[in-house]
Amino acid sequence: MRKKSHISLAKFLMNNMKVEDLNEHKKAFYIGSILPDCRPSFLTRKHSIDATFPILIEEIKKITVDYDMEQGITGYYCRHLGVITHYLADYFTFPHNSIFQGSIKEHCVYEKKLKFTFKSYVQEEDTQRDREQKGTFHSIDEIIRFIVKTHREYLMTLKVVKEDCQFIVDLVYKVVDAILQIFELNMMKLNMKNEQIPIECL
């Protein structure tokens, strides 16, 4: 996806997640969403699931199992969350997959069309959504398995721009929601521990 498409996705997520702490650091979130395209490695490493999945996993760990919960949601947290959305969105962009056999020019033409279609798609009323009230994922392993499973399903679908839009929004929204839910659950446990309330009461 092009940078403007990543920003469109980041704004959609910000508006639909409705997380106050995330909104306070939205600039860091937006920067993170385009950061992988601003690094020198962008010229040598494709943003495909085959090339960058280990990087994605490390990014997820940075704001889950390896994160200092006492800091709360910070600019660091939001920047890395933005980076996660970038890699995920690219995995579900047709030219970023090995099954794409087109030229660089065809790659650029596809992403240009995606830019305009995606901008309209995230503004449609039917695309808006609410956060999951019951935790669907309880660990990063479950999140990772979900990403892999969904990508396999994606590879078997018709490769058209609208399909990309739907997969990108659905997958990225669910993953970001899951990461935030893990954060919120860990914060609740930390607060209860600080208040000396037994964890068993959760």
Tell me the role of every PLM-derived stretch:
Residues 1-83, 88-202:
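N-terminal leader/auxiliary helical segments
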